[in-house]
């Protein structure tokens, strides 16, 4: 049980700094333009389903199947827009189920990571590297970063309410 002083300080901080929405990103794929064409057909474009908190990024209507040595996972959401390099972000549980030893990495840090087969409606590809378990991170706009006094790559602590807090 927290003291009234601690609760008062927490309330003041919330009022001063504001709260940051927290979410969990499920498994997803970022595709290069070349791989999008192979998987969905020449000239294919991603169809936005839901805009994400990061400006200009979205969850696409399109999904793929990812296939590892042990099993496959269907209906994996693609995030857009297209990227320079294809990457697959999964959970530790997914990695175990797929039979892949994926490292915890920052998004885009793909050197030396395992590959995977990606299957779409028009074709399939096998990437030699690009499967990661995403390092915990926070997306926030510049105004929020300034308000919290943080910059890109800073390490922060986050407190959340809930039954597992």
Label each region the model flagged.
Residues 163-165:
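Short, intrinsically disordered, charge-balanced linker/junction segments flanking boundaries
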Residues 21-69, 74-121, 126-159:
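Short beta-strand-centered segments at strand-helix junctions
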Residues 1-17:
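Short, low-complexity, charged amphipathic interaction modules
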